[in-house]
Amino acid sequence: MTHIPCFAQIAAGDIAFVGFNADNPDQFTIITTNYLEDGTQIYFVDAGWSGSALYASEGGILWTVPTGGLPTNTMVTFTGGGAGGFTTFPTGTLEAGVSVSSGTVVASGIAASMALSTNGDQILAFTGSVASPTFIACVNFNGSWSWTGTNSAEQTLVPPGLTSGTDCVVLSDKDNGKIDCLLLPDPATVSDYNNASNWIFNDAT
């Protein structure tokens, strides 16, 4: 019998970021805070939100949830390849060696590179399309929510539909960070993952 996936509407807070590494190779980890149907597709980009659109000069990847779906509290790690990032400049093709611990990943179709900056950056997660995104999570490790139009590759405003401290988080300008599980309540909620007080950091590889 042919398996036909039934797609549930994914919502803000159904995943949360729990780690990032901007020192090569780039890496980030999410946790599912709700069941994800198999075949669900999520974009991850390092493009900031200007208030009206994604910054055009940054790239991304498109992740597909594996057959059988993913239960709540599943961690998924994405690791860059090639020069350390996820997609190449200027074509936006997938770097050789990019991997994901569960599911599959392809280039997003954005003709730009996705490579995390050690000067601060952000990762936005959304469904829909690049032109019309529905945001579900964001980690900003540039120290503040801001958009000046200069050095825009490393800036973002709070994406629409998200609330800082609830389903997205702003963190210190550090190369690497992760949730400290010892600081989390049991059970942890999505807002616990998006509480900057529950994160630890370093600037080493």
Locate each region found by the language model.
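Acidic glycine-/aspartate-rich tracts in secreted/extracellular proteins
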Residues: A22-D23, T32-D38, G48-G51, G81-G85, ...
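Intrinsically disordered, low-complexity Pro/Gly/Ser/Thr-rich segments with frequent PxxP/GP/PP motifs
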Residues: G60-T88
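A structural motif detector for short, solvent-exposed N-terminal "entry" segments of globular domains
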Residues: C6-G48, A112-N119
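Short, basic/aromatic beta-hairpin or loop at an interaction surface
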Residues: D46-G59
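C-terminal segment of classical bacterial N-terminal signal peptides
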Residues: M1-P5
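Residues within well-ordered beta-strands of beta-sheet-rich folds
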Residues: Q27-I31, Y43-V45, M75-T79, Q122-F126, ...
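Acidic, serine/proline-rich low-complexity intrinsically disordered regions
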Residues: G84-L94, G103, G109, A115-S117
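Conserved beta-structured recognition patch
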Residues: Q41, G109-T205
